[in-house]
A protein has these predicted regions:
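Activation on folded, globular domain regions of eukaryotic proteins
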Residues: 23-27, 65, 71, 138
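A short beta-strand-loop-beta hairpin characteristic of the jelly-roll/cupin
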Residues: 76-113, 119-123
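Short histidine-centered beta-strand/loop micro-motifs
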Residues: 61-64, 80-86, 129
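A short glycine-rich, His/Asp/Glu-containing loop-to-beta-strand
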Residues: 39-77
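Extracellular structured ligand-interaction cores
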Residues: 70, 88-89, 124, 132-137
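Double-stranded beta-helix
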Residues: 130-158
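Short, structured patches in soluble enzyme cores that scaffold and shape functional sites
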Residues: 74, 95, 123, 129-131, ...
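Transition-metal
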Residues: 1-55
Length: 158
């Protein structure tokens, strides 16, 4: 047991208490880093070739806020990111390239810049690029929130 009166002021604060700081990642600065990652590691080696956007005040924690993860994913022509599913929900905002796809529970969607695709929790999904140009999209997942509830797990197909 512990006395509430000794910790109450740190449990319930008069103002929000967050380590999240505002930050901007400029496309002109990030695009080439993402494209360069294609020569550093293959999609097969990485499973998902992603550069994580970490909040500068949360280095090493793989999160952009207390509850959200974000990363920039690259799939080169001819590559496939194999099917898997996980308890986290995901969103994808396509930023560069035309013609790659995301398939959610077998339903294939061709991706173009500006498209917004959601992947509900625990749905099988994979990505592939049948086009002749690299594809980049922003991945957003609720990984930190799901981790907070100790509910994070995943399954690979086969």
């Amino acid at each position: 047991m512990a006395p509430l009166w000794e910790v109450l002021s740190s449990l319930v604060t008069p103002e929000p208490n967050t380590r999240t700081h505002p930050h901007i990642w400029y496309w002109k600065d990030t695009k080439n880093h993402v494209l360069d990652s294609g020569s550093i590691i293959t999609a097969e080696q990485a499973e998902r070739r992603v550069l994580i956007l970490e909040n500068p005040n949360m280095r090493g924690e793989s999160k952009i806020t207390d509850t959200l993860y974000a990363g920039l994913q690259l799939i080169l022509p001819g590559e496939i990111a194999p099917s898997h599913r996980h308890t986290q929900s995901a969103l994808r905002f396509v930023m560069h390239g035309n013609g790659a796809y995301t398939a959610v529970d077998g339903e294939k969607t061709i991706m173009r810049p500006g498209d917004f695709i959601i992947t509900p929790s625990w749905t099988w999904h994979d990505h592939g690029n049948d086009s002749n140009e690299p594809m980049i999209w922003l991945d957003g997942l609720d990984i930190p929130m799901v981790n907070h509830f100790s509910a994070s797990f995943a399954e690979k197909l086969n």
